From Swiss-Prot:
The gene is WDR48. The modification N6-acetyllysine is found at residues 214, 578. Residues 607-628 are annotated as: Disordered. The keyword Glycoprotein does not apply. Belongs to the WD repeat WDR48 family. This is WD repeat-containing protein 48. The modification Phosphothreonine is found at residue 613. The modification Phosphotyrosine is found at residue 28. WD repeats lie at residues 28-67, 73-112, 115-154, 166-205, 208-247, 250-289, 292-334, 358-397.
Length: 677
């Protein structure tokens, strides 16, 4: 089975455009941390986050700032990572459905494997064979030769993989022994399935758990397996006997993470109950409560620089990662100060972590304001912020203020159609544009706060402007207004660059903004930074990936049509006027009420007046000498427009009237009457 780097699926599947509003450098984990890997040789810790970013940290406690670098290429949660090749290569698995191969020392992505069709949840590594396995919600397990993966190039970009079939449910955990002779998977099927990766042969199925199997470990020779489950138990299995040989009921809730010492005598466990225990596998009654975290435990990593392990790193659903000392833990059996009764809580061995890698805040709440341009967000520290979706930036930090009060404070009686969606899954703002509604929102340049060079007030399409800004650096979108002959002269003189028109002419987005082209189902096709779209490789991939609906706007400059709104215009019952024939009118949904008032004054009221006058005024028609602005003034002085018996503000547009006042099905109906003098 071949897994290719890229597949040109843009023409076959519905493609959306997303971007992330964020700082250029995101030093801190912004959400829970799903996976950890320790490189003891370089004193480095790798954290894989729900914010889609893999970060590298120094574990040297003398270093004031532990942050080293970020590894960014994924677009969704990174669920697992493994260090290979003595720490030179990192493999990552993500909910964006990809497996990525990284240069761990330099921090860049070398290749992307797109074989999985759904979230990739788990990896397993056979150190002696440099073999990695990946598995996920598509129920597939793929085997990868790491040396082959690291040799991939732009021209040599196809890799062959073996697959293990037979899983009936989504896979959440995976383990392979160091020798690469046994692989075990855990799933929502509640069983352990075992294969021989050398032949891809199914060996056995182990039953016993009553819920999802979330964590798996194998000993070196592949004869014993440890499993942790959402059913709250840890089980020790003999693969030779094909049965469970011990069950450890250590936790009050689900067990999500396991680590074991090299001798396979002590298991370290953590999970939903936030507690981390060390249990002696030979004597289940001996278990030590090491510490209690502030959130459910997602992953643990033993410091194996000495035997017994001196410390354990712990990641949780919060963004902070802690290191807890294990010194003195193996003296507990002699002292008798251990927990042999789960119903009798004991004091943790550690009350404070030995080292802390601080995390950042995660956005957990969002409200789109009525102008459909600005957002209010609230994060895990209860800080509220104000954002500009159009310019892809934070406008203001408001601090710890009342979120609902801020929403009320910023309410405006204005209606703009929805044209984007917001996702907070990574803890940052991800904005998605879809062909179905991206071009729904038109506003006037004045209302958007933009000035036109000629002083006019053109109508602007928010989605169109944003797409042009996101792809501003892509040469294919550039427009050169000069003719070819002049172009050649200016090219020689070095003036051409200054004459090329880029972007939308009104604003730019931050150049570091990540832009993501992905299928509507969630699969990522291509991710790049705004500023990189001018690169040769990036331009080529954009040509393959950008959907036609985006090309129409950014390259061909074909702006979408205005939205029309149908409505009826009738005299108000109080005017005593005869009801006219019910003609269905149509106008731009941005048309202001005052323009309808002018129409009423000029085309209806004046005509009525004309029919009631004699021809004694030299046949001069009322309004013939009036200027256009005079009509506008007179219309506001003499005419009222109503909807649902509510007098309308002349500054309102028709879409706002329909949304806030009409509030009914069917076409909008407006009534007019002359103001009483």
């Amino acid at each position: 089975m071949a897994a290719h780097h890229r597949q040109n699926t843009a023409g076959r599947r519905k493609v959306q455009v997303s971007y992330v509003i964020r700082d250029e450098v995101e030093k801190y984990n912004r959400n829970g941390v799903n996976a950890l890997q320790l490189d003891p040789a370089l004193n480095r810790l790798f954290t894989a986050g729900r914010d889609s970013i893999i970060r590298i940290w120094s574990v040297n406690q003398h270093k004031q700032d532990p942050y080293i670098a970020s590894m960014e290429h994924h677009t969704d949660w990174v669920n697992d990572i493994v260090l290979c090749c003595n720490g030179k290569t990192l493999i990552s698995a993500s909910s964006d459905t990809t497996v990525k191969v990284w240069n761990a020392h330099k921090g860049f992505c070398m290749s992307t494997l797109r074989t999985h069709k759904d979230y990739v949840k788990a990896l397993a590594y056979a150190k002696d064979k440099e073999l990695v396995a990946s598995a996920g919600l598509d129920r597939q397990i793929f085997l990868w030769d790491v040396n082959t993966l690291t040799a991939l190039t732009a021209s040599n970009n196809t890799v062959t993989t073996s697959s293990l079939s037979g899983n009936k449910d989504s896979i959440y955990s995976l383990a392979m022994n160091q020798l690469g002779t046994i692989i075990v998977s855990g799933s929502t099927e509640k069983v352990l399935r075992v294969w021989d990766p050398r032949t891809c042969a199914k060996l056995m199925k182990l039953k016993g758990h009553t819920d999802n199997v979330k964590a798996l470990l194998l000993n070196r020779d592949g004869t014993q397996c440890l499993s942790g489950s959402s059913d709250g138990t840890i089980r020790l299995w003999s693969l030779g006997q094909q049965r469970c040989i011990a069950t450890y009921r250590v936790h009050d809730e689900g067990v999500w993470a396991l680590q074991v010492n090299d001798a396979f005598t002590h298991v370290y466990s953590g999970g939903r109950d936030r507690k981390i225990y060390c249990t002696d596998l030979r004597n289940p009654d001996i278990r030590v409560l090491i510490c209690e975290e502030k959130a459910p435990v997602l992953k643990m990593e033993l410091d194996r620089s000495a035997d017994p392990p001196p410390a354990i790193w712990v990641a949780t659903t919060k963004s902070t990662v802690n290191k807890w000392t294990l010194k003195g833990i193996h003296n507990f059996r002699a002292s008798g100060d251990y927990d042999n009764d789960c119903t009798n809580p004991i004091t943790p061995l550690c009350t404070q972590p030995d080292q802390v890698i601080k995390g950042g805040a995660s956005i957990i709440q969002c409200h789109i304001l009525n102008d459909k341009r600005h957002l209010l967000t609230k994060d895990t520290n209860n800080n509220v912020a104000y954002w500009d979706v159009l310019k892809a930036c934070k406008v203001e930090d408001l601090g710890k203020v009342d979120f609902e009060d801020e929403i009320k404070k910023r309410f405006k009686m204005v209606y703009v159609p929805n044209w984007f969606s917001v996702d907070l899954k990574t803890g940052m703002l991800t904005i998605t544009l879809d062909e179905s509604d991206c071009f729904a929102a038109w506003v006037s340049a004045k209302d958007a706060g933009f000035s036109s060079p000629d002083g006019s007030d053109p109508k602007l399409n928010l989605g169109g402007l944003l797409l042009q800004a996101l792809l501003e650096y892509w040469p294919r979108t550039h427009v050169n207004p000069i003719d070819e002959e002049e172009n050649e002269v200016n090219h020689v003189n070095g003036e051409q660059e200054n004459r090329v028109q880029k972007g939308n002419g009104y604003f730019q987005v931050p150049p570091h903004t990540p832009v993501i082209f992905g299928e509507a189902g969630g699969r990522t096709l291509f991710r790049l930074l705004c500023r990189d779209s001018g690169g040769e490789t990036e331009s080529m991939l954009l040509n393959e990936t950008v959907p036609q609906w985006v090309i129409d706007i950014t390259v061909d400059k074909n702006m979408p049509k205005f939205n029309k709104i149908p409505f009826y215009l009738q005299p108000h019952a109080s005017s005593g006027a005869k009801t006219l024939k019910k003609d269905r009118l149509s106008a731009s949904d941005m048309l202001q009420v005052r323009k309808v008032m002018e129409h009423v004054y000029e085309k209806i009221i004046n005509l009525d007046n004309e029919s009631q006058t004699t021809s004694s005024s030299n046949n001069e028609k009322p309004g013939e000498q009036e200027k256009e602005e005079d009509i506008a003034v007179l219309a506001e002085e003499k005419i009222e427009l109503l909807c649902q018996d509510q007098v309308l503000d002349p500054n309102m547009d028709l879409r706002t009237v329909k949304h806030f006042i009409w509030k009914s099905g069917g076409d909008l109906t407006l009534h007019y009457r002359q103001k009483s003098t």
